[in-house]
């Protein structure tokens, strides 16, 4: 701001005048020359004093007042002079500096952190949606298989039999055709073996014929009985203990359950017990790694549900979901499950912590509206859109993983307040690698 400058001089010292021309007398200053305006001092406050010369060399006239006015709207000062000393003072009205508006949340680095938080949240929701859909599909398929298997379970065959059809009804044992042939052949042998002779007496001798008739059929009957017993043994080798009452697809279910990692069984345990398992990754660890604690209430499920209804958020998240899940009704269907809703609420509660970073992040996410003018203004200042920030971070998970480092979080917090604080981390390789990665992802970001 251009201020007023007062320049004073006496009649005996005309060289002190700046920008003045004298014609006949030193007492009458003429108009100022505007050709050299840069000579005039532009200071807010100037105080100058000069020792008076000897009374003999000074005329008895009073000091003159010279006011140099430069294009300013408002201020003038009064100049007084005496024989002993001269004083010139210039003052300018103090202009109050407006405080920074509360809507200015932070620098672009802070919005990068907001993008990391949103991407971590959406990634967790996406992974759980996939697991939940897979578990639901498996349960539906197994229920259909059990229903189909129950249709074959009738009284015609035992429930544990691996054969889908009952055995044919067993008839009463009948004589073998070989046995009848042998019997008939035995009778023929008996007849032909004996010679009919004229008996010398009235009583014939039936003893040899009776022995042949009794002995030979008994041998044939025993051989056929052994063959029959051997055939029966062939069907009785399978013990009933080896057959189980499970369905034919039970082995497949056991193999799939054995080979599945812990992460795939995480959500099934949540559905059954209503809480995450003690071992393995839980929902809260995602945001605890970002520095979150259990300081207070964080983002609510209702706010998340409202955020997922935003078309802009859907545009950012849906490309990373399977094709069958790119539907807003899917999220509503998921959130109807009380166990899944409670798990999400526990995870969101852990987002609020004791650090300043966590408080700012939580407060920002609570009232985060991509369509609000303040958010648009912030992203316009850094030359990026919310879609670009979040999509680039979700495409590069290394950046989100790097934000789990507490030193990176502290550096991001300090540099968001004052960009010159980055000089403190010039020798920290981890922090500088993260900043270099951010500068590569967002080349238009400054500050």
UniProtKB/Swiss-Prot annotation:
GO terms for biological process: chloroplast organization; protein import into chloroplast stroma. It comes from the Eukaryota. Residues 148-160, 172-186 have a biased composition (Low complexity). Residues 161-171 have a biased composition (Pro residues). GO terms for cellular component: chloroplast; chloroplast envelope; chloroplast inner membrane; chloroplast thylakoid membrane; plastid; Tic complex. Expressed in seedlings, flowers, leaves, stems and roots. Keywords: Chloroplast, Membrane, Plastid, Plastid inner membrane, Protein transport, Repeat, Transit peptide, Transmembrane, Transmembrane helix, Transport. The chain crosses the membrane at residues 105-125. Residues 126-447 are stromal. InterPro entries: STI1/HOP_DP, STI1_HS-bd. The C-terminal half (89-105) of the Ser/Pro-rich region and the transmembrane domain are necessary and sufficient for membrane integration. Inserts into the inner envelope membrane from the stroma after import from the cytoplasm. The transit peptide undergoes a two-step processing. The initial cleavage to generate the intermediate found in the stroma is mediated by the stromal processing peptidase (SPP) while the final processing step by a signal peptidase I-type (SPase I), possibly PLSP1, requires association with the inner membrane. Part of the Tic complex. Interacts with HSP93, TIC110 and LTD. This is Protein TIC 40, chloroplastic.
